[in-house]
Amino acid sequence: MTPMALNREYITFGEAARHARRIFGTMVKPAGSACNLDCAYCYYLDKAAIYGGREPRMDFDLLERYIQQYIEGTDADTVTFVWHGGEPLIAGYDWFVRAMELQQRYAAGKHIVNTLQTNGTLVDERWCDLFRANNFLIGVSLDGPQDIHDAFRRDRLGKGTFDRVMETVDMMRRHGVEYNILATVNARSAGRGAEVYRFLRSVTDFIQFLPVSEHVIMEQGAARPHIVPPATEGAVPAPWSISAAAFGEFMCDVFDVWVREDVGRCFVQLFDATLANYMNVPPGVCSMCETCGETLVVEHNGDVYPCDHFVYPEFLLGNIGHDTLRDIFGSERQLQFGLAKRNTLPRECLRCQYRPLCHGECPKHRFAVSKSGDAGLNALCAGYKLFFRHTQPYMERMRHLLVKQQPPAAIMPWARRQPMRKGL
């Protein structure tokens, strides 16, 4: 939901409803949680249990209903479809051809944008032609050099996927497919921020670093830990999670290379979002907004949830078989979910000087306890504080450059004169 000029520490549903516009996004799971890989840290594989473990795929009638509802329901002139999983390509090539046809049927003058997140192992020449013809932006999951990537991103035979992903990246380059990289920051990445960044910038010019910080329980007889909502009693940090300190160090190390060598040439989502919050403009990523809830998640059977990190039965909002996306987005439950990002911050966050930069970050990470004993502190808080403290003089200088209508890249000569962190 759009940040509002309300300065109190609590926003009510009525206030939000009066300010809200029906501009929303969707993330759709055409094949649910189905995936050809078995990544250790995947937060979505568990969702198969909600739907009885069946091999799911959204049928064509429901696909048409979804596309029509979304285009007609949002007040936005540009409608962005986010195809996600699991692995969305499991839905099949013909399924996506049909989706493109339906988008054009119902576009009604609106601009249609398609983005798709993939593990990169099922893409072939035919897929590349489809992506290029329909101007897809493809997000490819790649965690870094081979030993880091293959530590957790393996197929169902236990084999690493690095070589297949790199072949896909080369194929998309040849076909002129626009792509970027999503890299998780996990226990194996710790201490290797500069190395990971230098590798990834050789592959792409846009990187999203996603911290892996999960709360899990081990159920009797289960093959893997079960990722649970933040407030679950008895849950513990997952073994693949990165610590707050290690995450902060990782991002500081990435930043120190980037700010000296790559401003304006390579784009790192966290850096862009942080600078945007310094400029008091929308950060472009929900985790760094004051409130959330702008993007509904649509499962393969039409079930709708407020966020793909909160696909649990207790968060189910409705189903497009009998509800409309527009009504679900405007419902009190959805608005309350988005407002809770701000309204449930612990006292430590309310007093924090960095609150305007992170707004408590993603609610899925809020399973720590503050020094004063308040529940709901972000488990990565110390790491974000380290990052914000370290980058503050650089961010303030880039903000000053932007105010003077100069490019942020002009900071690099000054940045190179600043002392480097050890080991870089």
Where are these regions (language model features)?
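N-terminal [4Fe-4S]-dependent radical SAM core
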Residues: 1-28
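Canonical Radical SAM [4Fe-4S] cluster-binding loop centered on the CxxxCxxC motif
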Residues: 21-61
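Local cysteine-cluster metal-coordination motifs and their immediate loop/turn environment
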Residues: 34-46, 306-309, 346-364, 383
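Short Fe-S-cluster ligation motifs
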Residues: 65-84, 337, 376-423
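Radical SAM/AdoMet-radical enzyme domain recognition
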Residues: 67-82, 91-229
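Flexible glycine/acidic-rich beta-alpha junction loops that bind and position SAM and/or redox cofactors
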Residues: 147-152, 208-244, 266-279, 305, ...
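C-terminal accessory region of radical SAM enzymes
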Residues: 243-278, 309-353
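Short, small/polar residue-rich loop motifs at catalytic or cofactor-binding pockets
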Residues: 289-292
